[in-house]
Amino acid sequence: MNSWWTYVNRWIFSTNAKDIAILYLLFGLVSGIIGSVFSFIIRMELSAPGSQFLSGNGQLYNVAISAHGILMIFFFIIPALFGAFGNYLVPLMIGAPDVAYPRVNNFTFWLLPPALMLLLISALTEEGPGGGWTVYPPLSSITSHSGPAIDLAILSLQLTGISSTLGSVNLIATMINMRAPGLSLYQMPLFAWAIMITSILLLLTLPVLAGGLFMLFSDRNLNTSFYAPEGGGDPVLYQHLFWFFGHPEVYILIMPAFGVVSHIIPSLAHKPIFGKEGMLWAMLSIALLGLMVWSHHLFTVGLDVDTRAYFSAATMVIAIPTGIKIFSWLATLTGGAIQWSRVPMLYAIGFLILFTIGGLTGVILSNSVLDIAFHDTYFVVAHFHYVLSMGALFGLCGAYYWSPKMFGLMYNETLASIQFWILFIGVNIVFGPQHFLGLNGMPRRIPDYPEAFVGWNFVSSIGSVISILSLFLFMYVMYDQFTSNRVVKTNPYLIPSYFDDNVIFVNEKLGVAQSIEWLLHSPVHEHAFNTLPTKSI
């Protein structure tokens, strides 16, 4: 009984940022698996023209799409990249004993499982929410979705919003007030900065989403007409409010991945990151510009031509700081003693390639004239999946990089690299052909299509099967890591270096590192620092 209570005390009532981070990671993986199941349903339905599995039920197809989008964004990438890595690594990197508000941190996590339950109940209620992850009225209004499904989905999103807001306040307070003596904000590692910028974006945009969703809720239940034209409202208002959150949201999703890659590449190329200040200002610029471009999602609603010109230009400008980041990573790789075959390095290189492709299609879509043709086609789907399903997801596989530090156990590098190649090939086969479908005008969110599109759709669905196989292999790699007892006590990525004058931190027992967390014991003790670390130079 006592051991059971210890277990509950550690995992349910936890105030330790590292334990909460592991809960976040586990929660994110479970949600990601459920989201992958929904995506598999979508791809199987589209594997051939006509009705395949959903017996012609278009509403059910749209429910699968809504569930897939919301699960992957709010319940997979944010908890896993922002929640898990943010909580685990930020306090270690800045030399803090924990986050600023440990109990709020616990509450922040435990808001998510009820939110997930609400979303899944919503999908199973009456006809389910068929509005996509964007939940646009009038499709999401009481006239089109009369049951409680959309209300439950709105409530679920509000809970995740509260969770992210509290988590952001917590991490910002931690970074401002709890840095090790002598460590200035400017000297923080890039990952900590990425989390800081992500938190600021969340705090600025989530209240707008909350307001927009609450007005939708009151339109549905309290007889207001914010978005109902018959009462003097305007559905386009919702689109503005939603995308003012929704566009910074995509930078919120990718920013921690930027931070992860900025640690993996220097560590495995044995060089300091190229242009750390430039990288930092690039991230800040991306965040600032990201708040100023939301209407590029609305080019088709009849905006003024000057407005379209501004939003096109502003969107293209984001390519500049993004390019700075890509070229700085490439410059870091140049001339380094690179460990090409290490799994985190494979993911970092994959990230660079695929994120660049996603960025290029983004520049195409930023042209308002072209976007009017491409809007709501599979070209857009291919674009943002290259950025998210390959950018954020490959960044998330930085879990491979830090997992020996988190668990003190090494993964099987051979299996993990096989898993990388299967995933890399799989996602490209899924989303590459979707560019061609979009160029030919195949619309999004439609469960059927003319036979002319069958070729590339079939290829795409084959890719989906390959990706799901890589997911199963990933689960086995995790199982193997926890059961095969390959204990790691030091930094597993260190190799003997004969010309190493770039050492930043040294610990006699554990070797050298570019950021402080690698100098700690693996797995990190509950109290990582016996005394506060002090920066001497």
From Swiss-Prot:
Membrane topology: Multi-pass membrane protein
Binding site for Fe(II)-heme a: H68, H385
Cofactor descriptive note: Binds 2 heme A groups non-covalently per subunit.
Leading EC class: translocase
Residues that bind Mg(2+): H375, D376
Family: Belongs to the heme-copper respiratory oxidase family.
Subcellular location: Mitochondrion inner membrane
Descriptive protein name: Cytochrome c oxidase subunit 1
Function: Component of the cytochrome c oxidase, the last enzyme in the mitochondrial electron transport chain which drives oxidative phosphorylation. The respiratory chain contains 3 multisubunit complexes succinate dehydrogenase (complex II, CII), ubiquinol-cytochrome c oxidoreductase (cytochrome b-c1 complex, complex III, CIII) and cytochrome c oxidase (complex IV, CIV), that cooperate to transfer electrons derived from NADH and succinate to molecular oxygen, creating an electrochemical gradient over the inner membrane that drives transmembrane transport and the ATP synthase.
Entry EC number(s): 7.1.1.9
GO biological process, one term: aerobic respiration
Involved pathway(s): Energy metabolism; oxidative phosphorylation
Complex and partners: Component of the cytochrome c oxidase (complex IV, CIV), a multisubunit enzyme composed of a catalytic core of 3 subunits and several supernumerary subunits. The complex exists as a monomer or a dimer and forms supercomplexes (SCs) in the inner mitochondrial membrane with ubiquinol-cytochrome c oxidoreductase (cytochrome b-c1 complex, complex III, CIII).
Cited Pfam families: COX1
Cross-link (1'-histidyl-3'-tyrosine (His-Tyr)): H247-Y251
Annotated positions binding Ca(2+): E45, A48, G50, P447
Catalysed transformations (reactions): 4 Fe(II)-[cytochrome c] + O2 + 8 H(+)(in) = 4 Fe(III)-[cytochrome c] + 2 H2O + 4 H(+)(out)
GO MF annotation list: copper ion binding; cytochrome-c oxidase activity; heme binding
Record keywords, A-Z: Calcium, Copper, Electron transport, Heme, Iron, Magnesium, Membrane, Metal-binding, Mitochondrion, Mitochondrion inner membrane, Respiratory chain, Translocase, Transmembrane, Transmembrane helix, Transport
GO cellular component: mitochondrial inner membrane; respiratory chain complex IV
Binding annotation for heme a3: H383
Cofactors that this protein relies on: heme; Cu cation
